[in-house]
Amino acid sequence: MLRNRVPRRGLAARRREHEVDAVNVLARPGSSSAARDARWYPTFLAVAATIAGLVLSACGASSRSATACAGSVAPAAAANPVQRENARPGTPGWQIPAGAGSVITGFASEISVAPGQSFHLHVAAPPGSRYRVYVYRLGWYQAAGGRLITCLPGCRSSQVATAQPPPTPPDPVTGLLRAPWQVTDRAAIPPDAVSGYYEAKLEIVSGPHAGAVGAIPLIVRQSPAAAPSAVLVQVPVNTWQAYNRWGGKSLYQFNTPSHALAVSFDRPYDQQMFHDMATALELPWVRFLECNGIDVSYQSDADTDADPGSLPRHRLVFAIGHDEYWTQQMRDAFDRALAAPTNLMFGSNSGEWRMRYADERRTIVEWRDPSLDPAHDPRVDNGFFGAFGEPECRLMGVEHLWAAQRDLTAPPTAYTVAGPASDPWLAAAGLRPGDVIPGVVGYEWDSMIPGCFAGTVTPLMTTRLAGSDGVTHSADMVRATAPSGGLVFAMGTMQLAWALDDLNGRAPDPQLVAFVKAALRDLTRPATPDIHAPRTPATQHPAT
């Protein structure tokens, strides 16, 4: 999230005082904050590139990851769709090097689709070059990491790229720009497709640019006709787009000459930034969940906004990775789900900024400061959720505080067990107070806020580390129990999965694996009332 914030002396009031100091709101070239972020970003990219390179070697080695898959979390009942899908042979070649996409790139007209629907792709490549599109589903697949679903126009054929127009000029007020490209390809998703992270890999197959690749991320939702999965993963596409600098505009000052107040899904993702988000923080979780046979499905932030009633149909909802940007409707959906009760799981720095959609959810609007927002509507004005009386800690038990961030190149810090040895999740892993789980806390983290959460908050792990201001801050992992009985597992870190899967070249930590499996078993037990709530008409929303 990359901004300056002041130490909390309360809740929302302290944030209001210092919103004008936020790097991503009003940082000026040459300011100390902007300079700090300019120093930070190249090192972030270097680490992300290293991680992306390690993907290539990690996918061929299943011995280390076998630790994370031993003793599956899933019950020994009939195989669920994810188990059946991951039993199929994987396909190498889905990996995209960090920083690719400068020669061939593209985006989809849809953020997500249901099985049986299609993605409409807008691909740009040097005119006259021939290219092919490979569509993969990403998952475990015995450590292969992906499976080839189809090729466009065919796995042995290709098509000629035509010229696409330049991006639109940035809007003089908001900085909004789009890529007004024609649809070049249609990727039909089979009716029996399994929900998940999908990827359209773009490759030039002949000519001087042969071998150049790019990628378009795709999300396939669960079929409306299917029984709701036990676990729903919310994919943080809003945050991907907030940091996306393609065309020279993101919501941030640190990676663009001047930040925008609105960004569009009608443009490619900067491939480096996509690796920073999805490859580093999300795919290790996807691999861990699927190798353990978890009954899981996936939907985007935009899907939650379109169908807020979708959350309580599942036993556990996981806001994966770095899920920083929510609409008010999304926040309300999570609040209602916890009251249902549906259990919740978070990484860190989740649901912090309130944004809104425009253009049928193809545009994200984020003015940052409600006093500047031309909407002048307390239900949709932009800013911290805490500025509107809804701090994250009321939902999660923890919250991201000012300067609780540092350079990603710094080695992640260990968590220290803070809960009692009798705690069922800790006991399942043989963890006792004072034990350490190395290398899982860094980049951005969350802290407990006493008296904020309405229920009980049980500390599980903690650590203290210096933030970007040089001051020592706490990072806290907690289990919060709401008055409804719903549980919240707030990890306090985005990097926990770095010790659950070997995607980043590190062997899984056996005790952390056992701990997370115990947590998932508890969080996915059948809830009361019945999790299979009636589907609302909004469920049948079109591709988003």
Q: Model-derived features: where do they sit?
A:
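Extracellular low-complexity, Gly/Ser/Thr-rich intrinsically disordered linkers
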Residues: 289-291, 304, 325, 432-533, ...
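A glycine-rich, often tryptophan-bearing local segment used as a flexible ligand/cofactor-contacting loop or short
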Residues: 324-422
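C-terminal region of N-terminal signal peptides and the immediate post-cleavage residues
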Residues: 55-72
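Aromatic-Pro/Gly-enriched surface loop or interdomain linker
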Residues: 128, 134-138, 150-153, 210-313, ...
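Helical hinge/lid and interdomain linker segments adjacent to catalytic or ligand-binding clefts
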Residues: 160-177, 186-194, 274-358, 500, ...
